[in-house]
Structures are given as structure tokens and as C-alpha cells.
Amino acid sequence: MKLLLDIREESPDDIPAIREVNNRAFGRTQEASLVDALRSNGAVLLSLVAALDGQVVGHILYSPASIGDVGGSALGPMAVLPAHQRRGIGSKLVEAGNRYMKDAGWPFIIVLGHPHFYPSFGFKPASALGITCDWDVPDDVFMLLVVDEQKMQSVSGLAKYRDEFSSVT
């Protein structure tokens, strides 16, 4: 019997499960608290869940970000329950979320994440494009996906996340 995976926007009923997914995937509560804070402050561009036969097993969130005066989006957190990792669920969440961000017209997506995971979706080290991070993080974990080449042609400088992210770093 094949299990049915559904990628969809979060609903209010999903909030406890989203907290649980983030807490278990990261082994701490900061990411779940970040998601709650972004949601409470109206700073969620997109929040998707991956539901396996109705059970939420994964979550991804996009929030506003900026580089200079250019507005874009920040991916994160993205989490999958440990028992369901390495099955392509995270990849499906990233693909669906990035497609939505592109269709919505956001010119870039930044991410702080695993340097062996995100490049397969087109993310590159942001420093190669003259873009730096708000925080002191290793160069290879701060990445950028250019969605609109024309809007990003002469953009460089400091990428800014929402203030809510300061509680996580």
C-alpha cells in the first residue's frame, strides 16, 4: 500500500503539529517559537505542510527579507519529522515553496541551511554574489536563489531577515 503525500498550505488546525515537527526535527524549541512569532506578527509569505495520509510530517515557511531596497523572501525553517527524513519530503516542500515564490514574483530567496541540500534547488553561496548575512555564519550555509535575474542584476550588500529570527541565531 502506497502512502499519499499531500503538500498544502497550513490551516489553523495544523499549528500544534507544525510545532511538533519543528521541535522534533531540530531537537529544540527555537524554530517552532520563530514560526509562531512570524505567524503572530503577520510575517508569513507562505507556510506549507507535508501531510502523509493526513498526518503532518513536514513543514516549510517563507517570510519577507530584503537586500538593500529590494524585497524578497527567506526560506526557513524547513523541517521533517526524523522518522520521515531522507524520503524526499523536504525536497518536495522546497520545490513547491520555491515555485510559489517564483510565481508570486519574489526576486530572490535566501536560506541558512545545509550546504549539501539546497544547491540542488539552485541555491548558491550568497557571498559569490556580493551578499552578506545579518549574522556571523559559515559562508557555505548562507545561500541565495536568484529568481528574477533582471531585478537582482546590480543588487549586493547585507541581506536582512525579519527581527524575529534574532531569537534563533
Task: Write out the residue ranges for each language-model feature.
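Short, solvent-exposed loop/turn elements at beta->coil junctions and helix N-caps
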Residues: V35-R39, L129-T132
